[in-house]
Curated annotation (Swiss-Prot):
It is found in: Nucleus. The keyword Protease does not apply. TFIIA is a heterodimer of the large unprocessed subunit 1 and a small subunit gamma. It was originally believed to be a heterotrimer of an alpha (p35), a beta (p19) and a gamma subunit (p12). Interacts with NCOA6 general coactivator. TFIIA forms a complex with TBP. Interacts with HSF1 (via transactivation domain). (Microbial infection) Interacts with SV40 Large T antigen. TFIIA is a component of the transcription machinery of RNA polymerase II and plays an important role in transcriptional activation. TFIIA in a complex with TBP mediates transcriptional activity. GO terms for molecular function: protein heterodimerization activity; protein homodimerization activity; RNA polymerase II general transcription initiation factor activity; RNA polymerase II general transcription initiation factor binding; RNA polymerase II-specific DNA-binding transcription factor binding; TBP-class protein binding. GO terms for biological process: positive regulation of transcription by RNA polymerase II; positive regulation of transcription initiation by RNA polymerase II; RNA polymerase II preinitiation complex assembly; transcription by RNA polymerase II; transcription initiation at RNA polymerase II promoter. GO terms for cellular component: cytosol; nucleoplasm; nucleus; transcription factor TFIIA complex; transcription factor TFIID complex. It holds the Pfam family TFIIA_gamma_N. This is Transcription initiation factor IIA subunit 2. It comes from Homo sapiens (Human). Belongs to the TFIIA subunit 2 family. InterPro entries: TFIIA_a-hlx (IPR009083), TFIIA_b-brl (IPR009088), TFIIA_gsu (IPR003194), TFIIA_gsu_C (IPR015871), TFIIA_gsu_N (IPR015872). Keywords: Host-virus interaction, Nucleus, Transcription, Transcription regulation. The gene is GTF2A2.
Length: 109
């Protein structure tokens, strides 16, 4: 099963809103909407793992951290993100990090 972290992104929220509208107008069933979301989870995780090759460095002050159910959560303050030609400063960042390897069954889906 793929992580559902990306459902709370702009793309994921837009997809969920569109699916909700289709359910309300009875154009699709809730079960079909769930299948679409599950496919989105798999596709976005695979695309990010295979296609994104940019590198960004960041530095900040660690406020809190937590490790629960194989998921790390970090909250950083006064963070600087550096790319090759760009520097972005933000007051607070929450990072959620999950194991990128498939820890489930060995079946291919």
């Amino acid at each position: 099963m793929a992580y559902q972290l990306y459902r709370n992104t702009t793309l994921g929220n837009s997809l969920q809103e569109s699916l909700d509208e289709l359910i309300q107008s009875q154009q699709i069933t809730p079960q079909l909407a769930l299948q679409v979301l599950l496919q989105f989870d798999k596709a976005i995780n695979a695309a990010l793992a295979q296609r994104v090759r940019n590198r960004v460095n960041f530095r900040g002050s660690l406020n809190t951290y937590r490790f629960c159910d194989n998921v790390w959560t970090f909250v950083l303050n006064d963070v600087e993100f550096r790319e090759v030609t760009e520097l972005i400063k933000v007051d607070k960042v929450k990072i959620v990090a999950c194991d990128g390897k498939n820890t489930g069954s060995n079946t291919t889906e």
